[in-house]
Amino acid sequence: MDSSRILRYEGRLDFGSLRARRIRAESEIPAVVYGKESDVLHIKIKSSEFNNKFAKFTDNTVLILSDGKIEKCVFIKDVSENLTKRLIYHVDFYEVDKTKDIERDIAIKFVGASVGVKEGGTLSVLRTKIKVKSLPLNLPEFVEVDLTPVKKGDQVTFKDIVLPDNVKLSEENENSVVLLVK
């Protein structure tokens, strides 16, 4: 596991807005971890560590929360922030079982310049996300679609998108059009 995805945490037993303010005053962020098969866990994380890594995270970044003994596989569910003060007030993490497949919508990243567009065609993007299924640690943050070979009159469907080996398409209709060039 990439060390940039590991966040250290400490458990906390005290709650409420007064205690949350004290935690933030100590350069930490109050947070909560919950999931379908786990109890709610109240934690605090170092503000500097989270802020340094937060800019690189997406909705599909799998993080490992660790207290030195227990590791939890999580996604960021919600971040409460004060934009004027540039402070993160609270983070909600959603825990998943790293041994079970999950379904997620991941971004489609379009790269290259389409031959059809160079010939005067118009590129119409109809979908920017794709539903996939995989183990959490195998989940890509996005998939790339190379537009270079797409000619005028061509279309790209979900089944045309190349996914990593351990990732499966989970769309109901694999023939749905993602983009086309007219």
Swiss-Prot record:
It holds the Pfam family Ribosomal_TL5_C. The keyword Zinc-finger does not apply. GO terms for biological process: translation. It comes from the Bacteria. The keyword Ion transport does not apply. Gene3D superfamilies: Ribosomal protein L25, beta domain, Ribosomal Protein L25, Chain P. Keywords: Ribonucleoprotein, Ribosomal protein, RNA-binding, rRNA-binding. InterPro entries: Rbsml_bL25/Gln-tRNA_synth_N, Ribosomal_bL25/Gln-tRNA_synth, Ribosomal_bL25_b-dom, Ribosomal_bL25_C, Ribosomal_bL25_long, Ribosomal_L25_dom, Ribosomal_uL5_bac-type. Part of the 50S ribosomal subunit; part of the 5S rRNA/L5/L18/L25 subcomplex. Contacts the 5S rRNA. Binds to the 5S rRNA independently of L5 and L18. This is one of the proteins that binds to the 5S RNA in the ribosome where it forms part of the central protuberance. This is Large ribosomal subunit protein bL25. It comes from Borrelia hermsii (strain HS1 / DAH). The gene is rplY.
